[in-house]
Amino acid sequence: MFFLETERLQLIPLTHDLLTLCQQDRAAMEAKLGLNKSDMRIDPLYMTELEDALTHFWIPMTAAHPDRYLWYTNWEIVLKEERLAIGGIGFIGYPDENGQTETGFMLDKNFHSKGYAKEALTGITNWAFSHVEVSTIIAKTTTDNLPSRTLLERVGFLPAGQEADLLIYNKQRV
């Protein structure tokens, strides 16, 4: 199974079958990956977004693009030593004709302010930029989400505009 590894984390992209299993029984999906059962503390708004993404994006898009599923799936953020999922990260699709893709991430509240999100975002952006077809990665966050904004800037994303109540950041290939 393909995964990315950083100092403390594994980033595991979920296949279509694993996403389907996750929708049915997250604990069974974690067990299949050899992970300990997680008990994530996630903001209810993000839970709704995750359920919507699973049903209306990740599952159908990984089925439609099996050869490029890495660009359309959730990557579990896993603590290597503890074998524990603490969040998710990924892209909203294969880079467009301008070489642009978008990333998003979520981390269990129990693991905020420990550098895990920075490590995961750095790892996945480095992986994306290793593909010649990627020139720009964008990320969007709400104007009031200061921790996310700070994280994006620490990883090298720069403010690039605003769309309604969302701030847009981008990072260019160096």
How would you name each of these model-derived features?
Residues 136-141:
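Conserved hydrophobic beta-strand within the GNAT/NAT acetyltransferase core sheet
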